[in-house]
A protein has these predicted regions:
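Positively charged n-region of N-terminal signal peptides that target proteins for export
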Residues: 1-5, 593
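Hydrophobic alpha-helical segments
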Residues: 17-18, 337, 573
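A sequence-level/structural motif corresponding to short, flexible coil/turn segments enriched
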Residues: 21-538
Length: 593
């Protein structure tokens, strides 16, 4: 009997070894402009023709340099000319202009297929890309003109064919810069099909003294199976959209009392704008009633033509915000907001709030860095100071240990919005940018950084309804780390984006010397790992249609090593005939006696 038990343990250990994490290096690239600011990783996406597109912003400043460097050398366009960003004349060497950079790459080799960039206009705080059915993509971003405040070209994009496409905007004429949103369609060959303003805002003078240069934030982007485009964010003034027939539709923000005209204050209303395939307004969704301080939708994903958004909202404990039949009453912290929305008519399936709390009675913060749809669940990742609870009377399910920010993970059921688990790093200053599910149903990898130290993966384990950070860590890149971009999970592949300072540091699995940067730089790296659990909702690659397997609530039984023992729909069915022992049933540890 003892021999059989020992043999069983050996077999379980062997199975566990099969699922052990082994992230294998495939390739990497380094990217930077010669500026002391800027050089920002944004996201990696997979196009419907099976390639990758890396979206970054590179810096330019005539005092330090305007060229773009790729793998340590000046990058050239299709005609062999060295690429240069906007000729921004900085007031000092510490400033810079952020230029758009889109690069389509072969996923196996990392070889660049084409490059699209901008040489006029400054990509400001928010920018996104999303794949389209033809193998191309849509770009949306907040754009500001720093090079010349009187110039009418807000953004100029240079396609892979060398053709330049301009988006024009008439400045206010008051010597101040203005920010507006730009949307553009890039085809599969890197040609700019079209580019234009998403809408226009009024830029009012606030309280008689401050010019409102930044009236709307375009934060999230998605495209449905019909090619319609969805943009989310928040706005502080009147915003005017144009419809296909040339008529205009104006929406006025309600929550403007807290706005002082600068980017430093939090104010305004959340929105989702539905546009047709050419960028004309079809429908606009915002709250029905509100008197809170501010609310915003920060991130957006879409699955099977259902939109999911995550955001934040702040009130005073008595003020309310109403969406349809749901009324929320946020306190004076940054509370976490998330919703499920029908793409067809922008009506709500649900909208929910997780209540934030302060550390030490005064410090609070929530930053949404990513929103993932993954095997029927939503993962919200980012940074937090303070705590989160399910409602105003519940005990917090996560809380920081200091006033400094820590990595945060919240998992909810995408179907009904029920919060499933939450996790926190436990140390500052850290951040989370993505979750990777594994073949062990009770563990996940969390991608994030330890500030000024490394980009990394940390193993979290589900224990008693919480995701707890363990000791297992994989340092993907050891360097003076400042931020990350949204990574890509592609089957068993993981493509990471990091922003180290001074040089590219030590990259896991890479050989050769590090790339020296002028200051900040970008590192794009691909790994593969058999421990990664792919998303069930695999793309067909045809017209961007996703096929989802039937999902039902289950009580499937696994060993602790993650080996499936039996499938079951109920607990009674799961435990019937099951030998005594410890199992994972329905995602929870269960002792069967």
């Amino acid at each position: 009997m003892m021999r059989k038990l020992l043999l069983s343990f050996v077999m379980l250990a062997a199975v566990a070894a099969v699922h052990a994490a082994d992230f294998k290096y495939q390739w990497h690239h380094t990217i930077y402009g010669k500026t002391r600011s800027g050089n920002t990783p944004i996201s990696v996406i997979k196009t419907t023709d099976g390639n990758y597109v890396a979206f970054n912003a590179f810096g330019s400043n005539t005092l330090t340099g305007t060229k773009l460097y790729f793998d340590g050398e000046p990058l050239k366009d299709a005609e062999g000319k060295e690429i240069e960003g906007c000729p921004y004349k900085g007031t000092n060497a510490n400033t810079g202009n952020d230029n758009l950079l889109l690069q389509k790459m072969n996923p196996e080799t990392g070889k660049v297929i084409w490059t699209v960039y901008s040489d006029k206009g400054y990509l400001y705080n928010n920018k996104s890309v999303y794949p389209t059915a033809d193998g191309g993509l849509v770009f949306v971003g907040d754009v500001r003109n720093l090079a010349d405040k009187t110039e009418t070209t807000l953004l100029r994009m240079v396609g892979a064919d060398g053709q330049k496409t301009e988006v024009n905007y008439t400045p206010a004429g008051n010597g101040r810069t203005s920010v507006e949103g730009v949307i553009a369609k890039i085809d599969k060959d890197g040609k700019v099909a079209w580019a234009k303003l998403i809408a226009t805002t009024t830029h009012p003078t606030i309280k008689g003294k401050t010019y409102g240069e930044y009236d709307i934030y375009y934060k999230g982007l998605a495209v449905d199976s019909k090619g319609n485009i969805y943009v989310c964010g928040n706005y502080m003034s009147a915003v005017t959209f144009v419809k296909r027939d040339g008529t205009q539709e104006i929406h006025q923000a309600k929550n403007t009392a807290a706005w002082d005209g600068t980017i430093q204050t939090s104010a305004g209303d959340p929105f989702i704008a539905k546009l047709d395939k050419d960028g004309y307004l079809l429908q606009f969704m915002t709250e029905d009633e509100s008197n809170v301080k501010f609310a915003t939708f920060d991130k957006m994903v879409i699955k099977n033509d259902v939109i999911y958004v995550s955001g934040r909202l702040q009130g005073d404990g008595t003020a309310t915000i109403k969406f349809g039949d749901t009324t929320l009453q946020p306190n004076d912290c940054w509370n976490l907001l998330y919703a499920s929305v029908k793409a067809e008519d922008l009506s709500l399936n649900y909208i929910k709030m997780l209540v934030a709390g302060k550390f030490g009675g005064k410090n609070y913060a929530v930053q949404n860095m990513n929103l993932q749809y993954y095997n029927g669940s939503l993962y919200m990742t980012g940074l937090i100071t303070g705590s989160l609870a399910d409602d105003a009377t519940s005990e917090p399910f996560i809380a920081t240990k200091s006033r400094m920010r820590e990595a945060m993970i919240v998992k909810v059921d995408a179907k009904d919005g029920t919060r499933l688990v939450g996790g926190i790093d436990g140390q500052s200053i850290t951040s989370a940018y993505a979750v990777i599910e594994t073949k062990d149903p009770i563990t996940v990898w969390v991608y994030g950084y330890a500030l000024l130290a490394k980009a990394r993966l940390n193993k979290y384990t589900l224990e008693e309804g919480k995701l707890l950070k363990g000791t297992e860590e994989i340092a993907l890149e050891e360097a003076t780390m400042g931020m990350l971009g949204e990574p890509l999970i592609d089957g068993n592949a993981f493509v990471s984006m990091a922003r180290p300072r001074y040089d590219s540091g030590t990259i896991l699995g890479a050989t050769g010397p590090a790339t020296t940067f002028f200051n900040w730089g970008i590192v794009l790296t691909k790994y593969t790992c058999n421990d990664i659990l792919p998303d069930e909702d695999t793309s067909t690659g045809i017209k961007d249609v996703n096929v989802q397997k039937d999902r039902v609530a289950n009580c499937n039984v696994y060993t602790l090593a993650g080996v499936l023992v039996k499938r079951a729909k109920t607990m009674a069915e799961a435990t019937s005939g099951l030998p005594s022992g410890l199992y994972i049933i329905g995602g929870k540890k269960i002792v069967v006696k």
